[in-house]
Amino acid sequence: MALTISETLRIGTRGGATLTGLGDVTGALEVGRRADIVLVDLSGVHCRPVHDPRAALLYSVRSTSDVHSVLVDGDLVVADRRLLTYDLAQILSDADAIAAELVDLSRGGTIQHYAP
């Protein structure tokens, strides 16, 4: 039996919150709960026509390019598709430096094995 759009959204919101033990603080837009909100841009041609915004969210939205803004516990962390809370360039630079150290410590060996 297929899930309805409403059931699928409920699983992704209230259900996800419940499974992570946060069902009493998040998972729904209600007074007293954390305001964890993702604002999605449905204006792209891949989202058109929008007969049902819920269906567009589930079937058409691209995971990163359509996310416009994000609030976590009411705090704006992404605005106009830009991360506000961390310096992404610095994070990537730090990660590259750590990876280089790991390669150096491996004495020329592999630091990660990928099965064929």
Positions of PLM-derived features:
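Active-site microenvironment of metallo-dependent hydrolases
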Residues: R10-P116
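Interfacial and helix-entry/exit segments of alpha-helical transmembrane bundles
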Residues: M1-G12
